[in-house]
Amino acid sequence: MADTAHQCTIVGIAGASASGKSLIASTLYRELRAQVGDHNIGVIPEDCYYRDQSDLTMEERYKVNYDHPNSMDHALLYQHLCELKAGNAIELPQYDYVAHTRKSETIHFKPKKVIIIEGILLLTDKRLREEMDFSIFVDTPLDICLMRRIKRDVNERGRSLDSVIEQYNKTVRPMFFQFIEPSKQYADIIVPRGGKNRVAIDILKAKIGQFCE
């Protein structure tokens, strides 16, 4: 049943892979949740909307360009944002980074006063931009992003060092310059230095906190 009295503010956080988007989103969520409660704020990672690839072999999945907009099911994400804004709950997909496809289970996600969505390609899609009440681009030097990506993918996602570097050179870096960096022009706020920028986080927290009241 829809919550007709519900008003939902969508905040988008974009930027390069391993730029600090998730850290900013989780920091804002953690600190604001302590102030306004879990029912008023939530986070949706764009990664949840990687396309289901259960019909592909593992070899075919390895060859997919996961940094290209076509790898994302933005149509479903757009539909879910519209549902949440209408006061309806959604079934949030879950993605398996080891199997390179969606998990069978979903998470029941209820509408919130503020929903933070974060991901590399969010600002490349006009439909998604139009659903955002304001947007942020995390601007972190690519060499720092690469070091963070290596650490994350090897330690958390079961990747080999060689595979991470190969993917970075083949798709991550080229797609950044083709799609992600140009989408910076659509951001309302640009945050340098990623999640280490405490001043920016405090400013964003104050701004987003207004919508949680």
UniProtKB/Swiss-Prot annotation:
What's the catalysed reaction? uridine + ATP = UMP + ADP + H(+); cytidine + ATP = CMP + ADP + H(+)
**What are the disulfide bonds?**
none
One GO MF annotation is: cytidine kinase activity
Q: Note one Pfam family from the annotation.
A: PRK
Record's GO cellular component, any one?
Answer: cytoplasm
- GO BP: CTP salvage; UMP salvage
Q: Which InterPro entries match?
A: P-loop_NTPase, PRK/URK, Uridine_kinase, Uridine_kinase-like
What are the EC numbers?
2.7.1.48
Give the signal sequence positions.
none
Query: Principal place where this protein is found?
Result: cytoplasm
Positions of ATP binding: 15-22
Q: Which biological pathway?
A: Pyrimidine metabolism; CTP biosynthesis via salvage pathway; CTP from cytidine: step 1/3; Pyrimidine metabolism; UMP biosynthesis via salvage pathway; UMP from uridine: step 1/1
Per UniProt, subcellular location reads as: Cytoplasm
Q: What class of enzyme is it?
A: transferase
Q: Per the similarity annotation, which family is this?
A: Belongs to the uridine kinase family.
Q: By its UniProt entry, which NCBIfam families does this protein fall under?
A: PRK05480.1, udk
Q: What is this protein called?
A: Uridine kinase
Name of the gene: udk
